[in-house]
Amino acid sequence: MRLVHAVLLPGIIVFVSNGNLLHAHALHEDETGVTAGRQLRAAASEVFGLSRASFGLGKAQDPLDKFFRKIINSRKPIETSYSAKGIHEKIIKAYDRHVFESKKAHDRHVSKSKKAHGRHVSKSKMAHDRHVSKSEKAPIQYASVADYLKKIYPGTDIERIVSTLKRHDEVGAKDLGAKLQTAVASQ
């Protein structure tokens, strides 16, 4: 016989096997000292027409989730001798609290995600703007470097320096040589 363990409602653990309700257990005790689980078992017993003695082996007439859905959707107690003790109200409140907490957690997650996305977009835009700004300034900078080199190295010396840079093994030096050559040629 395959045993299925499920948490069907916050705070209530239910063990089911092939449609048989084997055990319902509450994680918290209520203020009277009687566990909500005992009240739940008794309520399920009455709804499913099971006596307390045969409760462990009795066959449920409806799937368990229908029983819980009946309690939650009706928003009013199913008539049992335990209704007065408020088990149904507690189940509904626990379910509502669970839904509310889940929604709050979801909203916090969405809010954090939106903030993180906004920061990412902002940083990306700033990096892009810096990059664009550097490339716009670059021709002016290389032109001023070329001017300076022309003043220091007269005649063909500047062309020799640029040519040496272009043949250099390092990519940065080659790139600098090419940009300086463009700047020198445009002057």
From Swiss-Prot:
Q: Where is the composition biased (Basic residues)?
A: 111-125
- The ranges of region (Leucine heptad repeat region) come to 50-92
Keywords in alphabetical order, please. Answer: Host cytoplasm, Host nucleus, Repeat, Secreted, Signal, Virulence
Give the start-end ranges of region Highly variable C-terminus domain. Answer: 137-187
Q: Where is this motif: RxLR?
A: 38-41
User: Quick one: signal sequence residues?
Assistant: 1-19
Where is the protein localized? Answer: Secreted; Host nucleus, Host nucleolus; Host cytoplasm
| Bias-annotated ranges (Basic and acidic residues) | 126-136
InterPro entries the UniProt entry points to? ATR13 (IPR031791), ATR13_sf (IPR038525)
Additional comment: The ATR13 effector protein is a highly polymorphic member of the RXLR class, yet only a small subset of the polymorphic residues appear to be involved in RPP13Nd-mediated recognition. Polymorphic residues of ATR13 appear as clusters across the surface of the protein. ATR13-Emoy2 is not recognized by RPP13-Nd because it has Ile-152 and Gln-181 rather than 'Thr-152' and 'Arg-181' within the highly variable C-terminus domain.
Tell me which family the UniProt entry assigns to this protein. Answer: Belongs to the RxLR effector family.
- This protein's name: Virulence protein ATR13
GN (gene name): ATR13
